[in-house]
């Protein structure tokens, strides 16, 4: 299970989540039915070589649409919703419209559902970026607890590993026998890791040359982070094409606000080098527990925090599943049906 301990990483996760929720809200509920689609039109009475013009639905104009089933099967996926607001061309009673009416009668040659484009490009990129960033956070936390970290004060003591406390409690309560193998293993790991960190800080190039696996792990961690942030920032630079006329100004402003905030937050986290705490040396050395109350307090706090985090995850996952099942048909109807 994943618990985001770093406030910097947590802020980025919250911003990405909020950005994705805003996009989903606009796609499902925020777009007006008259501003979901764009149409490639040509005024009635003009030559066939006249260039097509993309425009959104305008109630002051008369849009003559294609038949119910286009002869060449040229409709795009989910574009049928765009033809619901059109008038079939064969039911128009007049033969040749007057010149004054030509500018108000449009023949529709193609329709595009812009919500489909938004759903399958931006929303998907945000979701993929969100999962990649969570994968980066998971790898980073595991490396801080068990791997090589520089500077050394960023290391997390392996003894705080939840499995260590859980194994100790289970063995002492149910088995009535002290189990210390995990504790000894973590202590040995802590000593070896401190030696590796000293070697890495002395000569990083030689260290990574003789231990390429560590370099690969760190490289994968950095790649996940940069790819995730790149996908999120890239959503603001995706070409909207002709669909730009349907998207409101607030969506553009909201997109750039979220993207710039996420990018600046990550840049600040990367460039910022916080000073080492004054008691870093004391904290690095293993200290003795101050009596039974200190041991019980540490055990209870870590176990209860782990249980609370797992309960929160279960509640969030269950809530998302229930909401998705309850509103699945409604979401599909709003997106792709009439």
UniProtKB/Swiss-Prot annotation:
<feature type="glycosylation site" description="N-linked (GlcNAc...) asparagine; by host">
    <location>
        <position position="48"/>
    </location>
</feature>
<comment type="similarity">
    <text>Belongs to the alphaherpesvirinae glycoprotein K family.</text>
</comment>
<dbReference type="GO" id="GO:0060141">
    <property type="term" value="P:symbiont-mediated induction of syncytium formation"/>
</dbReference>
<dbReference type="Pfam" id="PF01621">
    <property type="entry name" value="Fusion_gly_K"/>
</dbReference>
<feature type="topological domain" description="Extracellular">
    <location>
        <begin position="31"/>
        <end position="121"/>
    </location>
</feature>
<keyword id="KW-1188">Viral release from host cell</keyword>
<dbReference type="GO" id="GO:0044178">
    <property type="term" value="C:host cell Golgi membrane"/>
</dbReference>
<feature type="region of interest" description="Involved in fusion">
    <location>
        <begin position="31"/>
        <end position="121"/>
    </location>
</feature>
<keyword id="KW-0325">Glycoprotein</keyword>
<keyword id="KW-1032">Host cell membrane</keyword>
<feature type="topological domain" description="Cytoplasmic">
    <location>
        <begin position="141"/>
        <end position="212"/>
    </location>
</feature>
<comment type="function">
    <text>Glycoprotein that probably modulates membrane fusion events during secondary envelopment of cytoplasmic capsids that bud into specific trans-Golgi network (TGN)-derived membranes. Also plays a role, together with gB, in virus-induced cell-to-cell fusion (syncytia formation). Seems to block fusion of virions with infected-cell membranes.</text>
</comment>
<keyword id="KW-1133">Transmembrane helix</keyword>
<keyword id="KW-1180">Syncytium formation induced by viral infection</keyword>
<feature type="region of interest" description="Interaction with UL20">
    <location>
        <begin position="265"/>
        <end position="301"/>
    </location>
</feature>
<feature type="topological domain" description="Cytoplasmic">
    <location>
        <begin position="265"/>
        <end position="301"/>
    </location>
</feature>
<dbReference type="GO" id="GO:0044175">
    <property type="term" value="C:host cell endosome membrane"/>
</dbReference>
<dbReference type="GO" id="GO:0039700">
    <property type="term" value="P:fusion of viral membrane with host outer nuclear membrane"/>
</dbReference>
<dbReference type="InterPro" id="IPR002567">
    <property type="entry name" value="GK"/>
</dbReference>
<feature type="transmembrane region" description="Helical">
    <location>
        <begin position="213"/>
        <end position="233"/>
    </location>
</feature>
<feature type="glycosylation site" description="N-linked (GlcNAc...) asparagine; by host">
    <location>
        <position position="58"/>
    </location>
</feature>
<keyword id="KW-1043">Host membrane</keyword>
<feature type="topological domain" description="Extracellular">
    <location>
        <begin position="323"/>
        <end position="338"/>
    </location>
</feature>
<keyword id="KW-1040">Host Golgi apparatus</keyword>
<dbReference type="GO" id="GO:0016020">
    <property type="term" value="C:membrane"/>
</dbReference>
<keyword id="KW-1181">Viral primary envelope fusion with host outer nuclear membrane</keyword>
<feature type="topological domain" description="Extracellular">
    <location>
        <begin position="234"/>
        <end position="243"/>
    </location>
</feature>
<keyword id="KW-0732">Signal</keyword>
<protein>
    <recommendedName>
        <fullName>Envelope glycoprotein K</fullName>
    </recommendedName>
</protein>
<feature type="transmembrane region" description="Helical">
    <location>
        <begin position="302"/>
        <end position="322"/>
    </location>
</feature>
<keyword id="KW-1039">Host endosome</keyword>
<feature type="transmembrane region" description="Helical">
    <location>
        <begin position="244"/>
        <end position="264"/>
    </location>
</feature>
<feature type="transmembrane region" description="Helical">
    <location>
        <begin position="122"/>
        <end position="140"/>
    </location>
</feature>
<keyword id="KW-0812">Transmembrane</keyword>
<comment type="subunit">
    <text>Interacts (via UL20 interaction region) with protein UL20 (via N-terminus); this interaction probably plays a role in the coordinate transport of protein UL20 and gK to the trans-Golgi network (TGN), and is required for the cell surface expression of gK.</text>
</comment>
<feature type="signal peptide">
    <location>
        <begin position="1"/>
        <end position="30"/>
    </location>
</feature>
<keyword id="KW-0472">Membrane</keyword>
<dbReference type="GO" id="GO:0020002">
    <property type="term" value="C:host cell plasma membrane"/>
</dbReference>
């Amino acid at each position: 299970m994943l618990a985001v301990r770093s406030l910097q990483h947590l802020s980025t996760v919250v911003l990405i989540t909020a950005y994705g929720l805003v996009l989903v809200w606009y796609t499902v509920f925020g777009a007006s039915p008259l501003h979901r689609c764009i149409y490639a039109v040509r005024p009635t009475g003009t030559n066939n070589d006249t260039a097509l013009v993309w425009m959104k639905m305008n109630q002051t104009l008369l849009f003559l649409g294609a038949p119910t089933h286009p002869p060449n099967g040229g409709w795009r996926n989910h574009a049928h919703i765009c033809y619901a607001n059109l008038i079939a061309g064969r039911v128009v009673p007049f033969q040749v419209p007057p010149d004054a009416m030509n500018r108000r009668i449009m023949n529709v040659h193609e329709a595009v559902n812009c919500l489909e484009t938004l759903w399958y490009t931006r929303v998907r990129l945000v979701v993929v970026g969100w999962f990649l960033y969570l994968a980066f956070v998971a790898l980073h936390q595991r490396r801080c607890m068990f791997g090589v970290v520089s500077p050394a004060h960023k290391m997390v003591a392996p003894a705080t590993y939840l499995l260590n406390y859980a194994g100790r409690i289970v063995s002492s309560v149910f088995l009535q026998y002290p189990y210390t193998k995990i504790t000894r293993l973590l202590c040995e790991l802590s000593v070896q890791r401190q030696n590796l960190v000293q070697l890495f800080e002395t000569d990083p190039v030689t260290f990574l040359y003789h231990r390429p696996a560590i370099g690969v792990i760190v490289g994968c961690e950095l790649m996940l982070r940069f790819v995730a942030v790149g996908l999120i920032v890239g959503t603001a630079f995706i070409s909207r094409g002709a669909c730009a006329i349907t998207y409101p100004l607030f969506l553009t402003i909201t997109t750039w606000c979220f993207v710039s905030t996420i990018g600046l937050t990550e840049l600040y986290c990367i460039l910022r080098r916080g000073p080492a705490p004054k008691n870093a040396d004391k904290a690095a050395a293993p200290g003795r527990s101050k009596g039974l109350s200190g041991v019980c307090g540490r055990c209870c706090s870590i176990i209860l925090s782990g249980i609370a985090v797992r309960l929160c995850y279960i509640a969030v996952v269950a809530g998302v599943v229930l909401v998705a099942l309850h509103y699945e048909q409604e979401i599909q109807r709003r997106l792709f049906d009439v």
